[in-house]
Every structure is written in structure tokens, then in C-alpha cells.
């Protein structure tokens, strides 16, 4: 447990600490544990023995740097070397060599891995902890049925249940169950041992009849009976060694291995003293569990809450990597066995290096990082996103739940989450409640449990100590919430405070409190802790805000928030986007690409990140903050990164906002903005896209990168250099060639020119033609070329193609259709950009920058935005920044409102502007219509909230189709922007058009523009030469498809005309 000596002081732990600790545990303990399980191997004649010496393993320095691994699409990894020995027993000789086992991906300073040039992160998983759990359910008759569920380390489940006659059964499958006596006998206990080790032997004897005695008469009979019920085998199976192995593999290995954590939980729940290194289920465990189940039936003992965090364990990066390393060693073992037997068969002399290959380990880790659901591509939209992604907790994944089967109870907040899992920050949609986020101070304990820190309140010692409590321990203490921090120290003993005890919230006297919270942010995740005045918001809107802050785009001119919570500096520091001085010294050179530091007689060059692309195409860039000649100390910030200012997180801008309706343009949360935000680049961001092309060696010859591309217009090739690659700094438009490439292919006989046929006939020369396969800039990709990388991998074969990467930067101003949001879940789409002179203006003549809909506040109950808006106005006028911790009402009633009004009053006094704070309507002000100059009828709330521009931008979403591809079966246009798809006119849209009687438009939609093949071909020709489009004569392709499908069901669809003369109805019959 961590104890902090400083009285009443605690520091926020590093936000990436959980990832670092997990990877260190894998390197320090996991590797040794798995290598020690590697068996000694002998050949069939037992003449050669191979073994690994675990005591001496080495991890070599990485061969490449992180930056090079990203650009060259390689894995940032370290080679693992282990000493191995080969013993010849007949000659009594041993050959020892240090061999390469394989490459292990390394974690970098961000807590992430670089695999094939892509930043990836392994998130933590929450699983049901192995052990035994007792539940009670009502059967169809309304009678309580008690069950005990044993969960193995692999997630397999076995159930014990007790029926009305107090008989105990072990359920081995969904339909089959066997007597507890048969299970215990199959595990090696006889009847006397069973009766000696239970508390209720008379209950066990009560259902012991002659048939049961025969089943448990011997271990072989019990195993046969168990196997017959488990495998649902009919007849009379014969006892054999293979039958035992099959049962061991299918049942006992999967459902009876408890592991270290499961053994500890089993001992605690059943009051056993079995050694913790005995990790398998024993007959003694089964009998103790049955005793406890009988006690439950008689009303003794307590049932288990399966959703309590004390019954969960965290599967961290250490556990996942250790599992994969163990799997790789099993594969390596099979390879070594096969190599030994092959060498003996061919009478070769093996060496340790010849026996071991690095392929199993390398491929296993590459497969894990590429395919495992818990290994995800790092979201690097902004610095906050990077940190939050590594602190996620997921119930999904192997051995966990699925989004469709998880119940509401599992998704819901549990009292044990308090201080460990954020009750607010979770994903929206089908995974709500299944993907959470760690609270700020939470950490993973040695047994996989989540621990939260508290201050211990001791009567004997006045010194405050900080302890980390696990979910199973804090049940036994009275835990005071953050409200107790505000108590007057002199009269604490007389105060009554809210506290938590055994998952209940109580109000108790101060002297009864054992522990108290250490921090007002303790219960929330990083995203939720960055929301000012969060206590005034509805939790649903706070959830949206914590998700939307992760979607904020870094702006070209960042600005830190006027109103914050104080956590912004820590987030920026731990995100890794800042350049930090590693030791003190003097700056002797500074530039946009590097800073040179002189200290202790050594010169250190610190490279800066310049226009680096993130996974979400945002621009990561560092800007120097220290002038040349200045002395710096260790830990001082040398350069700001993307979305940081002065070492603080800066995701958005403080803009002047009015909450008022304006001609209906902010209907349904739409937002009006001033043209100032466009022309002054207030919300301008840079986005970098990567385009790549590979060159292969085909069967007709190698592909060629060249600038000489036939049959293409010259203006498309204008930006290519002599090698056929686009020049740095070129401005490129849609359709331009970025890389010129020709692919060789053999031409058909009929396509040869006469002179080619002559050459072929006389000289026998094979004439080949080339196909143009250039890299072209797709729609919406216009911009400036900022980098070109030509990566030539070793070998140069078709399996290692050369790759060319082209990076293009786009400058995007804010425009109609972009999404903006505040920090309180108030989001909206920009509906119109008004001229500055048309925007409403304040009494000092300043036009507002944005207009929000006031109806978005009362129904959403996110009143925190009003506090932030008004306090931001005071801060902008007084040139102040505020850092306010949440729940300030614990100090005084209406503390937030009093703070805002006092600051507005002071701003009004200092600026001599009485309109800033008017007592009749505090926080509001009379503003004027920019078009007419008349004041609006009602006073309006104005202020400077912090508004973010989100990554959902109209340039990435807007799409139109003139022509494109068609589906092969239905012949209708494809769906989606990526496939150049069309807009579907479905059944309900057809009804809408029918309602207006637009027959010709409807016919166009269903024929020419859709799936009438002949008619849509005629449209093109008619459009070029002019004239009317002919009506389609036959049915469209989708109707023909329906007819064909009916024929496949042996239904023939015919049509014929019924004349009025032959069309008669017998009205009497009808």
C-alpha cells in the first residue's frame, strides 16, 4: 500500500502509469514465468536432450528508432536472446549457445506499441474473477433454487445446485447433471474421505442408494459414469487411458484450473487453507462448496453480488502479452521436437542455434497486435485522446461479454465503482456501460483488482496517511465522501457527514469515519474531470462531453481555456506531445526542427516533431517556446505540441457567444457563426493525408515508376519529377498524378500494330505493352505535398514490394456543415456564416462570434455551460484564467453562482461597463440587431465559453454522384461515399413522390437513374446530341431479378390482358 508522508498532500499519478507498470511486469516476471515452463526435450532414443537456461535472458537494444519505424512501416521491437544447451547423454557432453528466440514489440514513452509502422495500444479487460459464487433464483414454481458457480481461470463454468430434497448435483453441461458423490469419486475420493470432510454427512448419506453405491464403488466406475453423462455416450463405455485423457482435456483442464487468483478467492470464500501454488480444483474444494451450499439452503451465509468489483479482475497488458508469449513457446516446442527428430533421422549433428527459429514468437506477436480485439489502433486525434485510450476498461473481448448479450444490470453503475471506474465516461450506442474508463487515482493491484486511495483518519496519530483499498477491503470501513474536505478543522467532531458503508450511502458523525476521499476528481475519468461545473450538468450530457472532447481537432492557433478545472497541465504533460528538458542547461540554438541544449559540458540535440500525421489525419506539430541563450531547468517545457499552449491542454477557442434565436437558423441545435472565425483563421486546422502505392515484380516483369506515361494529358503530369514522383511543395488537385507507374502486360494477337507483327515474325521479339497504374489524387484530396517517402525493403522480391508514401497537407477553415461543441454536451452543426455587420452586437459595439439556441439548455439540463459562459466573459474582460475544481458547493451553498456574479461585478467595475452586470437580470445583457440597429426585446446571456471544432467535418462527409459503379446482381448503384455510391430511393421515398403525383420524376428514379441497363445507356447519347429521352420499353433489372428468383422457387410469373368483355364477377358469390 502506498503511504504518503506529506500531511494532506497527494499527487495525481501519471496517466500512462498503468500501461508502463503492466509492460514492466511482463518483462520482469512474465517472461521468466513462461520460459521456466519450457520443458526439457529428448529424442525418441533419449540420446539428445535440449533445454533453455531461464536465468540468463537478454533483451537487445532496438535496431531502429521509433520515428523510423513509423515512416518505414516496421515494428519497434527488441530481440530476445536466451541461453540454450544441447546434451549428448552417451558422450556426456553439453553444447551451450546464446540463441535468438524472436522479436518482442517494445512499449514507447507514450505507453503504446509501434507495429508495422502503426501506433497500437492494448486496453485493459474486466473479467469475472475465478472462484466460486453463490446465487439464488426462482424456479417456475416460485421456489428459490440455490446454485454455486465455479469459474475457472480460462472462463469455464461448472455449477453445483441443491434441489428440494437437499440432494446436491453438479451440472456438467446445459442438460446433463451428475451426483456430487460421483464427481468427488471421479476426482479420487472414496466414500469414507467424503463423509469425513463434510459438515453434513447425514445429508450426503440420505441420497446414497444401492445404485449410487455401485457408481462410486471404485474410481473407475465413477469416471465411467461421469464420462457417460458428460459426453452423452450411450451403451457401456470401457475404462481406458484414452478415455481418462479425453475427460482430462475436455473437462478438467478447461473448468478446473483456478489459477493463482482463483485459488486465493476459493480459500477466502470457503475458509480453506490450501497452498496458493496448488492452482487446480481439488475434491476438498468440491466438498467445502457443497457444505456452503447446504448452509445457504438453511439460511446461513450471504449470496454474492456478481457485479461487485471484488468479484472482477483486470486483465492488463502484462497478462495478455504473457499469454501470447506462452502460446509462442508452445509452438516453438513443436518446432524444436520436429527439428530434433529430423536431424536424427538424417544423421545430422544439431546445434542449439539450428534447432530454434524466431518465426513462432515473431508471428504470434504480430498476429496478436493485428487481430486481437483488445489490441487497437491508437486514436491520436488530439493529446487527450491518446491518454484516454490507454485508460479504457472493456468487458468485451475473448472470455468476456458481447454487446448483444450483456444485460442492463451489467452495464449499470455499481456502488463499488466509486473511485475506481468513472460513472460518467462510457461509449454511446450498443457498447454503453461495457467500455468504461479508469478513475484518475485508480490503479491495478497485484491480484488484478482495482484499488482506490483514501486518507486514513486515526485518533492515535494526527499524521494523515494515504492507503490504497481494494473493493473487498473498503466494505468494512466507513468512507466519507469529498464533502468532508470542507469541514472546519476546529469543529469536525461535531459535524455530521455523508459516508459510504457496505455499498450504502449514510449520514454519520465525523468520529465514526475511518477513511475519507483525497480529491474531488477522485471519482471521475480524465475526460469528465476536464468539464468545469460538471456538478450542474445532467450525467447524460457530461457523458457526451467527455466523448466529444476526444474528437476535438487541434487548431492552427491554439488558445487555452479561460475557465478550466486545473487538470489541463497534467494531461498535456503526460500525453507526450510536449518537448521536455531532460536535464538543466542553456539553450544555444533553436529552430523549427530542433533545439540544442548545452549542459554539464555535453551538447544535446532535441528534435522537434514537424507536420507529423496522426492516425486520424490530424497534424501533430511542435513549436519552440524557449528563446536562445536562456537557461532551463530539468523538466521545463521547451516546445508546445499540437493543441497545447504554455504546457496546458488547449483544444478549442474562447469565442463570444450569445444564447438567442435568430431567424430560425439555430433550430434543432444549429449554430450561426460570424465570418470573422473564417477570415481570421480562428477555427482553421491542418489535416495530413497519406497516399501510398506499391511496386511489384509481376510475371510479365517488374513494374516501373516513371514520369513518361503515354495517353495521359500533360497537365496531369505537371508535378512529377524525372523519377515519376510528385515534387515536394507542389499544389495538387483532384485527378493529378502523384506517382507515375506502368505495369507490363502481354498484348493479344489482334491488338498488335502491323510493324509489331513484322518484328515478331522476322526476329521473334515478344512485344509487350504497359498498362497505366498511376497513383492519382482522389476526390477531396487537394492540398500541398509536404513529404514523400520511397521505402525499399530488403530483397526487392514480389513478397517485399517497394512502397511510396505521399503526404499531403490540407488547410481547412470552418464552414457550413462542420460540427462544433462545448464542454457540456452542447453540440451543433453550423447552419450559416453571417457577415460581421449582420451579427448581433454588444453595447460596446463588439459583434458576437456564435449564436446558440437557448432551448438547448433547459431540456438537456446542462446548466454548467451558463456558468462557464458568464465566468468566461468576466475572465476575458479582466484578463484572468480560472481553474475551478468540481463540487464547490461543498464549501458553501450557491458557491458557483456567487463566484460568477462576484467576478462579473468586478469586471463591470473595472471596465466601467455597467451592462456587464445588471442587477435586474444578472448575467444577461441588452444586445442589438446588427441589421437594423434596434435592441432585441429581451436581455440575452452573452459570454466567452470554450468551443471546440470536432473532427466530423463536412469535407469528409459531403458526396455527390453523376455516374459510377453498379451492383452486379441488382444493377443498382452501390451504396456509400467510399464506393462513389448513389442516394437510395426506397419504398417510403417512392410513396412520398407518389403523393405529389410526379410520375415522370418517379419513372426517372426507378429506371434511367437506377437499374434499367438499356435506358441509362441511351440517356448519355441523347444528352450529348440533344433531343428527348425515350421512354423505357421493358422492365428494369430489379424486376427481372425478382422474376428469376421466383422461378428458382418453381413459380412462373406471366402477364396477360383481361378485356372488360371477358372480365365478369359473380357478385352473389363475392
Curated annotation (Swiss-Prot):
Any one GO molecular-function label of the UniProt entry: DNA binding
Gene Ontology, cellular component aspect: chloroplast; DNA-directed RNA polymerase complex; mitochondrion
Superkingdom: Eukaryota
Enzyme class (EC, first level): transferase
Pfam families named among the record's database cross-references: RNA_pol_Rpb2_1, RNA_pol_Rpb2_2, RNA_pol_Rpb2_3, RNA_pol_Rpb2_6, RNA_pol_Rpb2_7
GO terms classed as biological process: DNA-templated transcription
Annotated keywords: Chloroplast, DNA-directed RNA polymerase, Nucleotidyltransferase, Plastid, Transcription, Transferase
EC number: 2.7.7.6
Disulfide-bond pairs as recorded: none
InterPro entries found in the cross-reference section: DNA-dir_RNA_pol_bsu_ext_1_sf, DNA-dir_RNA_pol_su2, DNA-dir_RNAP_su2_dom, DNA-dir_RNAP_su2_hyb_sf, RNA_pol_bsu_bac, RNA_pol_bsu_CS, RNA_pol_bsu_protrusion, RNA_pol_Rpb2_2
Location(s), subcellular: Plastid, Chloroplast
Principal subcellular localization: plastid
PROSITE patterns assigned to the protein according to its UniProt record, in alphabetical order: RNA_POL_BETA
Catalyzed chemical reaction(s): RNA(n) + a ribonucleoside 5'-triphosphate = RNA(n+1) + diphosphate
Quaternary structure and partners: In plastids the minimal PEP RNA polymerase catalytic core is composed of four subunits: alpha, beta, beta', and beta''. When a (nuclear-encoded) sigma factor is associated with the core the holoenzyme is formed, which can initiate transcription.
Family the entry assigns: Belongs to the RNA polymerase beta chain family.
PANTHER family linked: DNA-DIRECTED RNA POLYMERASE I SUBUNIT 2
Function text: DNA-dependent RNA polymerase catalyzes the transcription of DNA into RNA using the four ribonucleoside triphosphates as substrates.
Protein name as it appears in the record: DNA-directed RNA polymerase subunit beta
Organism: Spinacia oleracea (Spinach)
Gene responsible for this protein: rpoB
